[in-house]
Amino acid sequence: INVNNVNIGKPFTTENNGYSNLMTPNESRLRNYSYLASIIVDFESTIYINDNGVEIELDKKIIKNILIGSIPILLRSKYCTLNDTLYNDECEYDYGGYSIINGNEKVIISQERKVYNIPQVFENNKPSCKYSYVCEITTVKENDYYMPRISTIKITKKQNIYENHLRVSLPHLKQEIPLFILFKALGSLNDKEIINYIIDNDGSKLDTQIIKILHLSIEEGSSIETEFEAIEYISKYINNSTYNVSDEKKIKYVKEHVLKDYLTHLPNDLSKLFFTGHMVNKLLKCYLRVIPFDDRDSYKNKRIDCIGPLLGSLTHQCFNKITKDI
């Protein structure tokens, strides 16, 4: 099923006799109405049948002008009746920017959230935790309302810095996996090439120290030699996997969901390799006290979502619910 021709209409009110007329904001205030606009779409359904492994497409069916919901209209916005004309019962000094729900004027309060698509390194002070430092990133595509995905790279907390392993936590996985196996699943099979993604490549003492720290992580991923073996290894730790699911489906799931939802803001595996190396580089520099840790409470690591992103996210959630019901 495809959704086409999305249209947002003007606010209308329907009387008891069936007559509809354009609603003004003041009318919605006086009559305790909600100042809403209808969302109308066309549904295009296509049926496919499988004939001995050959997919055959049957005729398409288009259902036009389907009402799927309503959305609050902000006063003086593009879809508001005051956008074109100022009615006599409206104040000319009212700049709008609010909605009217059941006759009451409502505003949407901006919400604070952590920044997306920027890696941050924090120290884990919990004594029971086996990882001392974590590089965390919350990713989402730009101008997209899909659910943010969290990925982390962690280092164990042994006293000797050269006896620690690096592990990665990915979306849809129930357990961390070795760092170098992730690199190999993304297409980088040579250990030297992987190290070059991580270090500064300036021949400094810091590069030498980072390579020594990576030594155990290199050994941990040495049993995996091909990209397929790396993906097969990751498929063993899929969330909610059942014993009835075939290995082929698990491998397909890793390719289409696990690796795709890792660093979702990046377009391809090559850019993910570079960015993963950057995350490891930052984690190890914080671990070695070369650069400071990030401050969770600093406003440079936060963003404020105003009404546009908040309404967009809510609309996306409601639309997903509709598609699942269909």
Where are these regions (language model features)?
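N-terminal non-catalytic structural scaffold regions of very large proteins
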Residues: 1-326
